[in-house]
Amino acid sequence: MRIETNKAKWPLIYHGNGPAKENEIWKKTVKQWKNGADFKPNCTPEEEGITVITWSIPEETTMLQKSFEKMGMGKELIVIPITKPFNWLDKIKKTKEYLELIETKYILGLDATDVIVSSDIEGKPTIWYDVKGVFKNFNCKLVYNAEKMNWPSSDGHGTNIKEMDGLNGNLLRKLKETEEFEERIYKNLMDSDFYRFNSGGFMGYTDFTKEFYNTVWNKYVEPVYEKGFDEGFFGGDQGFLRIAQKEFFPDVTIDCNCKLFQTFAGINPDDIRGIYE
């Protein structure tokens, strides 16, 4: 199953982020995927030098796990366990820790509950080869998926931080700078509607991704880690990763043209040219 965008792109990974769950285009995509035939790629992610990770409660079977099972590759997905009560910042902490164990050249991180891996162009079995090829064409070291929604936003949506909140207020000031950066680079310069950072899908060179996550942890997350039980503190993990992108640009970028990742929150029929078996 594949989708084609209005820019004649064929993204490989689909993310029904946030409010996309009620989007009719996402619902149609999920239905097509569920009803579609199983397929077997010609190689594993590891054979292409890719480790694929996700984060979920061990007892649950998620959409991403089912996607891998349809490929006959359930064991190729590394599930980093997240336990209740949720500390949303564990996603950063545990990713940072697990990155130290990875020996492959590339790391692909995908949210568990709302991500589907496509069956590739015309059902050809080269999905992992193509994922790697698309990533390398970004000419960056780490790419995140991009979305239309601004979350968390400096006007208070998704965060309860106020600008006068001492050290925490610095996070909000950084967020305002990041919003302006995203608008300048991805909206105005790149002429994209998908100009906001989303943390639910990323791919990078493992060594550089280690550096990025260590910096985010040490500089932004560790001092406020205990506040992570409240997703509304700073948008879960997303706010922290998002504000770090500017200082790492252009090594860190977002997929504003949806070449690798397609997010679905806020999309409309004009964004998608077709959904195909």
In which residue ranges do the predicted regions lie?
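A short acidic (Asp/Glu
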Residues: 62-65, 117-122, 127-129, 154-156, ...
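Conserved donor-nucleotide/metal-binding helix-loop-beta segment in metal-dependent transferases, i.e.
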Residues: 115-177, 181, 188
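A conserved donor-nucleotide-binding helix/loop in the catalytic core
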Residues: 84-110, 114-120, 126, 197, ...
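Short, high-confidence coil segments that cap the C-terminus of an alpha-helix
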Residues: 9-11, 104, 139-141
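Catalytic core and acceptor-binding pocket of nucleotide-sugar-dependent glycosyltransferases
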Residues: 1-26, 178-277
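A generic structural motif
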Residues: 42, 76-85, 143-148, 227-235, ...
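N-terminal anchoring/stem segment of glycosyltransferases
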Residues: 14-106, 207, 249
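Conserved beta-strand elements of beta-rich interaction domains across eukaryotes
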Residues: 18-21, 57, 85, 114-115, ...
